[in-house]
Design a protein with these regions (language model features):
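Jelly-roll (double-stranded beta-helix
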Residues: 1-205
Length: 205
C-alpha cells in the first residue's frame, strides 16, 4: 500500500527526446521507476516543438490531451488517420503500436499523456470542474489545470497534483474541491484507473 504522492510539474526536470523534437516530464508510473518496457501505467506531460513520428509502444493503449499551444496534427495516412488535436482539454485515444506522425500546427504545444499496458489497467483521461476524491480508485492521478483547489489543509494550483496506487480503503481520503474567487474557471485532469483490459479503437479522423 502506498500513500498519496504529491507532485509539482514545475519541479520535475524535463527529459529531452532523442530526436530533439520535444521533451517529457513524467508525473507518475507504476511500478515506480519502471522503464518504458516494464510500466503498467504511466502519466506524463510532453512539450512538442518539432514534427516527427511518435514512438511505437506495442501492447500499450494511449490517450493524449492538449494543455497549451496551437496543438498538433496526428497523421497515419496508411491507416486512414488525420486528426487535428487543436482543442484544449479534449482527450483522444489510440493504440500505441500505430505508426503516427506528429506535426505542430503552430509553435510548441504541451500535452497530457496516459499510457496503459494492455491487460493490466483500464481508465480514461477526464477534465473535472467539481469535487473529486484522490485515492478513491485502485490507482490514478489528478493534476490541477486551472483555478485553485483545496485538499485538506492544502491549496493546489495549476501543475500541482497527486497520484496513488492502492493508497487506502475508499473513504479514507479528503476530497479535492474547487475554490471560488479566482479569475480562472477551476479545472482538474482526472485519471481513475482500475485493473482490467482496455483496447482503444483506432484514432478517429
Amino acid at each position: 500500500m502506498t500513500a498519496l504522492q504529491r507532485f509539482d510539474l514545475s519541479a520535475i526536470a524535463p527529459t529531452p527526446w532523442k530526436n530533439g523534437g520535444g521533451d517529457t516530464r513524467e508525473l507518475a508510473c507504476w511500478p515506480p521507476g519502471a522503464g518504458m518496457d516494464a510500466f503498467e501505467w504511466r502519466v506524463s506531460v510532453a512539450t512538442i516543438a518539432a514534427p516527427g513520428p511518435f514512438s511505437a509502444f506495442r501492447g500499450v493503449e494511449r490517450q493524449i490531451m492538449l494543455l497549451d499551444g496551437a496543438g498538433v496534427r496526428l497523421r497515419a495516412l496508411d491507416e486512414g488517420i488525420d486528426h487535428a488535436l487543436d482543442e484544449r482539454w479534449r482527450p483522444v485515444a489510440f493504440a500505441g503500436d500505430q505508426a503516427i506522425d506528429c506535426i505542430p500546427l503552430g509553435g510548441a504545444s504541451t500535452d497530457f499523456n496516459l499510457m496503459l499496458r494492455q491487460g493490466r489497467w483500464q481508465g480514461a483521461v477526464q477534465v473535472l470542474q467539481t469535487a473529486c476524491v484522490p485515492g478513491s480508485t485502485p490507482a490514478g492521478l489528478c493534476m490541477v489545470l486551472s483555478g485553485r483547489w483545496q485538499w485538506g489543509s492544502e491549496v493546489m494550483q495549476a501543475g500541482e497534483g497527486l497520484w496513488w496506487s492502492n493508497a487506502a480503503p475508499p473513504g479514507a481520503h479528503a476530497a479535492l474541491q474547487p475554490l471560488g474567487g479566482g479569475a480562472d474557471t477551476p479545472a482538474v485532469a482526472w485519471v481513475a484507473l482500475v485493473p482490467g483490459f482496455q483496447l482503444n479503437r483506432p484514432l478517429a479522423q
